UniProtKB/Swiss-Prot annotation:
Stated name of the protein: Transcriptional regulator MraZ
Main location: cytoplasm
Species annotation: Burkholderia cenocepacia (strain HI2424)
Gene: mraZ
Annotated disulfide bonds: none
SUPFAM superfamilies in the cross-refs: AbrB/MazE/MraZ-like
GO BP annotation list: negative regulation of DNA-templated transcription initiation
Coiled coil: none
Keyword Magnesium: no
Pfam family, one: MraZ
Amino acid sequence: MFQGASALTLDAKGRMSVPSRYREALQGQAEGRVTVTKHPDGCLLLFPRPEWEVFRAKIAALPMDAHWWRRIFLGNAMDVDLDSAGRILVSPELRMAAGLEKEVMLLGMGSHFELWDSQTYNAKEQAAMAQGMPDALKNFTF
């Protein structure tokens, strides 16, 4: 299970160092193999390969009227491996799609991660908080 936020920096080649607290889990669960794809909210999704296969099967089974969503998720997916330094390479196409330049936020979302441009994430988080809690959380006890 992946959780927590990590402020990270992409190097000049577009590589991101995966926080050490996740590396062992990714090595054990997926032999260091991850799949990166677009998310319609403007970030990237990073899945350990076994979790990607579950997600991929769900997307592939969507009805024909969702064919563009299959293209977005599956057509943009790229398989990458952690290198010996614990880094993954985010392709130029995916970096451009998510507006990633240098400063990024990696969010553990349970079975997978979201990778955001730091400024974009902060702006979207502030906007969400300004709107107040959605009805689904109004009866939730913190």
